[in-house]
């Protein structure tokens, strides 16, 4: 029986209603497929990134073998350590004429320093005169030439104006500033106490010139690998004594983490030693009733100390080329208990690359004779005084040495 024409027309021409229920399965299917593709791509990219890191981590040998280190939380940068811009008041001297004038000494108004290319120079007024070279040329201050050219670090004036110099690679020297005559007192590489001198750093001399106290920062690392020494936290730094009469070298203290700057106490019965990696200053007793002992003079400094020098107030100037900002972030503090990250970093990057990430914050503090902080001078971005290694006071001015900057800085203390 045939359907009525009207009913058939309505069925054939009935409008199709498109509902959400009809499209949802198709939409969900597309989403699931896209999600799977995204996860596959993500896993693939992750594998491409992680696989090389795993290869680096397990197959490449790290140049350092870091030790677990425990540092206290850095002190707040407030009070005596309150940030300021006082180091920016300094004047740059002999820009691009002096590279890396690490340490400074004066005899009267004559200023002496050593440079990155192995020279000992005299500064008189506006002139620079080379008085001696400790190593052998060619000397361009490069990493490759440092061991043969020499790298003068600590410098002091002894009796009668004689200069005493600590060279990182070549040892201890006595230099006649008039004739330029050089005398090697202790050779680097010499075996002392069963270990070689590998990184002779700073020194001080008794008033009579009989004893020279000096630091050997490490028997494992050389100066050109100083960041390796800091990051590894190697405890092989030493304090030694050289007797100018008997010519004997004696180990006074060992197991220091980066023994750096050294300064005789006024009574000459003890020396202050910067233990750089630990952000503190130790006091080593070199004579008297406490000879052979050691205690902590200042702990938990706001930066990593380099050279220590007397101030006119009877206290001490301490230079720091890297700080431990609080509030803020200190990479060395963060990594101190993560030796595996240190190993990975040194597998991937060279020291020169890593130094580009070290903030150029320079800090100089003046300590009382008791070790309490008196005042501090800052250059938060190293805009004027960068990589400060020493603060040497003379005639109302503070001369600022640097282990890598191509200039010397001079700060008028009456203006700060």
Curated annotation (Swiss-Prot):
Pfam families: SSL_N, Str_synth. This is Adipocyte plasma membrane-associated protein. GO terms for cellular component: endomembrane system; membrane. Signal peptide: none annotated. The gene is apmap. Glycans are attached at residue 160. Residues 1-39 are cytoplasmic. Belongs to the strictosidine synthase family. One of its GO terms (molecular function) is arylesterase activity. The chain crosses the membrane at residues 40-60. Residues 61-412 are extracellular. It is found in: Membrane. The lineage of its organism: Eukaryota, Metazoa, Chordata, Craniata, Vertebrata. It comes from Salmo salar (Atlantic salmon).
């Amino acid at each position: 029986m045939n359907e009525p024409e009207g009913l058939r027309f309505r069925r054939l021409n009935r409008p199709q209603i498109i509902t959400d229920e009809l499209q949802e399965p198709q939409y969900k299917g597309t989403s699931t497929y896209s999600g799977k593709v995204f996860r596959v791509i993500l896993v693939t990219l992750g594998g491409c990134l992680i696989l090389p890191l795993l290869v680096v981590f397990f197959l490449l040998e790290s140049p350092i073998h870091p030790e677990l280190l425990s540092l206290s939380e850095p002190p707040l940068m407030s009070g005596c350590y309150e940030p300021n811009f006082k180091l920016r008041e300094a004047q740059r001297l002999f820009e691009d004429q002096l590279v890396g004038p690490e340490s400074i000494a004066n005899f009267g108004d004559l200023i002496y320093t050593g440079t990155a290319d192995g020279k000992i120079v005299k500064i008189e007024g506006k002139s620079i005169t080379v008085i001696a070279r400790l190593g052998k040329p060619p000397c361009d201050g490069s990493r490759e030439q440092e061991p043969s050219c020499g790298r003068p670090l600590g410098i002091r004036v002894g009796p009668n104006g004689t200069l005493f110099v600590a060279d990182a690679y070549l040892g201890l020297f006595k230099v006649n500033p008039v004739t330029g005559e050089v005398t090697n007192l202790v050779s680097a590489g010499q075996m002392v106490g069963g270990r070689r001198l590998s990184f002779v750093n700073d020194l001080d001399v008794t008033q009579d010139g009989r004893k020279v106290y000096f630091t050997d920062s490490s028997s494992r690392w050389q100066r050109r690998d100083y960041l390796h020494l800091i990051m590894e936290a190697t405890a092989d730094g030493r304090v030694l004594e050289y007797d100018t009469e008997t010519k004997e070298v004696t180990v006074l203290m060992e197991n220091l983490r980066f023994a750096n700057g050294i300064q005789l106490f006024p009574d000459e019965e003890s020396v202050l030693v910067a233990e750089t990696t630990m952000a503190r200053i130790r006091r080593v007793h070199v004579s008297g009733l406490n000879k052979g002992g050691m205690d902590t003079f200042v702990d938990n400094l706001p930066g990593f100390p380099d050279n220590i020098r007397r101030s006119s107030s009877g206290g001490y100037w301490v230079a720091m080329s890297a700080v431990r900002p609080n509030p803020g972030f200190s990479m060395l503090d963060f990594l101190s208990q993560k030796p595996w990250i240190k190993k990975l970093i040194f597998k991937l990057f060279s020291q020169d690359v890593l130094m580009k990430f070290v903030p150029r914050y320079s800090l100089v503090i003046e300590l009382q004779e008791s070790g309490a902080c008196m005042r501090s001078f800052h250059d938060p971005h190293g805009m004027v005084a960068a990589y400060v290694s020493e603060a040497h006071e003379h005639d109302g001015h503070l001369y600022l040495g640097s282990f890598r900057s191509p200039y010397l800085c001079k700060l008028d203390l009456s203006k700060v």
